[in-house]
């Protein structure tokens, strides 16, 4: 795919804007210059880069925010990015790029260019597959260039035989934020953590399948990704694939629509570890459940590991046939309970360290004592408290935390916060109709309202990312991730955004209590 002249011209304008952006240093611009536009599909710009380091740099917060702002200004609408790797990518030979390279090299003076350390690049086939997976509705390509799973299958000693490193990182869908090292262990999750660790060290030998259940926001998804990362670190040739049940359903439907059933089977049945999240959402989807049943059987019979999460244990799952529920019980079933006070404090401490948030131990203890059931809401409370302190140039202490959280603590006897409640309250607050809120329009007010709604749906409900995108006009889950991150950051930078989120949350809580 080659970008047309209009897209190339727009990209040059975006690069020019970034050169004047204080957030993007000369070193970071060195990575920007390596990117080349491949085309614009809908509101998604396809960029190709020569290696993983460049892609990770462009996706980092510092560059991504500046890039998103520049793209929005250039195209006058919110533009998403899909960045792929192309090992054969050649730098564009244009006067402007030559001038930039000359500038980076110091021009006539011959000064040194920015010190950019680049690793070996991935293959072009990996690039095509990465683009296909990052764009909604794209057909699934079989990972033909990856080392066969059989090469990494567990041997007779119960350990997989290490295979040559593969390029399966792009197909695994693993989130780099979730590792065992960042998982806080407590009495409520110790056994689940130990089981997950054992599965990663000996796939299909320790517990197969491993079934982890518990309420939303307690760390089940974190453990799934951690299993994948640890297993791939131990056995580089291992094929791992993470998928939530809604993505599995969408991939299955697309395979039928495009008559690519064989490709779908190759993607999901030719792996060493399948990590499937929120299996309960497959309930009553007969054709999809049937396909998963056969996928499970194929993997299990070929001595491949399956790890499943759910909000309920197998026996309590409705909408599944007994033959599938019984298979969930073949291995190990373990649960995760809400964390105790000590674990909640440890979670907040680790979150504060990771995000660079300043909060004394007594403030962390106060927050942990007030929110006891949901880790996502617990971390959200910490972000609100520290954001309020930053905006008002105050020090975080118990009194400040108490003031910020006084209207946010949920009464356990109150009604459940539903998506409808959040969307209705958001529409009222911003004087928008539900149709406008879920439309494709991207005026500034609508974009802000929509992003705040996504943030609140993420924080106050148990909805998955794809489901949140679905109720807001069928948007991709990556849009939800971007909105959640954007609002978190803006709350600490802009008083208007902080006030809007706080006032809207208070109104939702008030309606929840029936006040």
Swiss-Prot record:
Region described as Domain II: spans on this chain: 89-172
Region annotated Domain IV, binds dsDNA, chain positions: 390-515
One annotated Gene Ontology cellular component of this protein: plasma membrane
Subcellular location: Cytoplasm
Gene Ontology terms describing biological process: DNA replication initiation; regulation of DNA replication
Annotated spans, Domain I, interacts with DnaA modulators: 1-89
Subunit-structure text: Oligomerizes as a right-handed, spiral filament on DNA at oriC.
Full protein name: Chromosomal replication initiator protein DnaA
Native source species: Micrococcus luteus (strain ATCC 4698 / DSM 20030 / JCM 1464 / CCM 169 / CCUG 5858 / IAM 1056 / NBRC 3333 / NCIMB 9278 / NCTC 2665 / VKM Ac-2230)
């Amino acid at each position: 795919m080659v970008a047309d002249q209009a897209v190339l011209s727009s990209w040059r304008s975006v690069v020019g804007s970034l050169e004047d952006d204080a957030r993007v240093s000369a070193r970071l611009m060195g990575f920007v210059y390596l990117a080349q536009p491949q085309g614009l599909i809908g509101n998604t710009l396809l960029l190709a880069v020569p290696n993983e380091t460049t892609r990770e740099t462009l996706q980092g917060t510092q560059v991504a925010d500046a890039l998103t702002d520049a793209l929005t200004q250039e195209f006058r609408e919110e533009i998403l990015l899909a960045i792929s790797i192309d090992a054969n990518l050649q730098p564009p030979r244009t006067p402007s790029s030559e001038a930039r390279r000359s500038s980076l090299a110091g021009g006539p003076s011959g000064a040194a260019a920015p010190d950019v350390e680049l690793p070996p690049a991935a293959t072009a086939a990996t690039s095509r597959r990465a683009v296909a997976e990052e764009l909604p509705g794209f057909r699934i390509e079989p990972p033909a260039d990856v080392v066969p799973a059989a090469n990494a299958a567990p041997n007779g000693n119960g350990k997989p035989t290490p295979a040559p490193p593969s390029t399966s990182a792009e197909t695994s869908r693993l989130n780099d934020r979730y590792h065992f090292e960042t998982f806080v262990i407590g009495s409520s999750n110790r056994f689940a953590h130990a089981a997950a660790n054992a599965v990663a060290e000996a796939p299909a030998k320790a517990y197969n399948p491993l079934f982890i259940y518990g309420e939303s926001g307690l760390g089940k998804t974190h453990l799934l990704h951690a299993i994948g990362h640890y297993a791939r670190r131990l056995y580089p040739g291992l094929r791992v694939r993470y998928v939530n049940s809604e993505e599995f359903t969408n991939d299955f439907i697309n395979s039928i629509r495009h008559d690519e059933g064989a490709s779908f089977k190759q993607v999901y049945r030719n792996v060493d570890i399948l990590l499937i999240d929120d299996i309960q959402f497959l309930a009553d989807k007969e054709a999809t459940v049937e396909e998963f049943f056969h996928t499970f059987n194929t993997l299990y019979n070929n001595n491949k590991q399956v790890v499943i999460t759910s909000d309920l244990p197998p026996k309590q799952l409705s909408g599944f046939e007994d033959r599938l529920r019984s298979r969930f019980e073949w291995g190990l079933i373990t649960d995760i309970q809400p964390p105790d006070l000590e674990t909640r404090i440890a979670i907040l401490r680790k979150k504060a360290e990771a995000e660079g948030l300043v909060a004394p131990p007594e403030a962390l203890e106060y927050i942990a004592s007030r929110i006891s059931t949901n880790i996502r809401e617990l971390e959200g409370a910490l972000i609100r408290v520290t954001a309020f302190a930053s905006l008002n140039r105050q020090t975080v202490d118990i009194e400040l935390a108490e003031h910020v959280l006084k209207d946010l603590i949920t009464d356990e006897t109150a009604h459940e916060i539903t998506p409808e409640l959040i969307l209705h309250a958001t529409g009222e607050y911003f004087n928008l109709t539900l149709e406008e809120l879920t439309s494709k329009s991207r005026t500034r007010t609508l974009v802000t309202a929509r992003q705040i709604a996504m943030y609140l749906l993420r924080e106050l409900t148990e909805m998955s990312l794809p489901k949140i995108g679905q109720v807001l006009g069928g948007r991709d889950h990556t849009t939800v991730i971007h909105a959640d991150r954007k609002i978190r950051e803006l709350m600490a930078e802009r008083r208007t955004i902080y006030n809007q989120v706080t006032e809207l949350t208070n109104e939702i809580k008030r309606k929840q209590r029936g006040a």
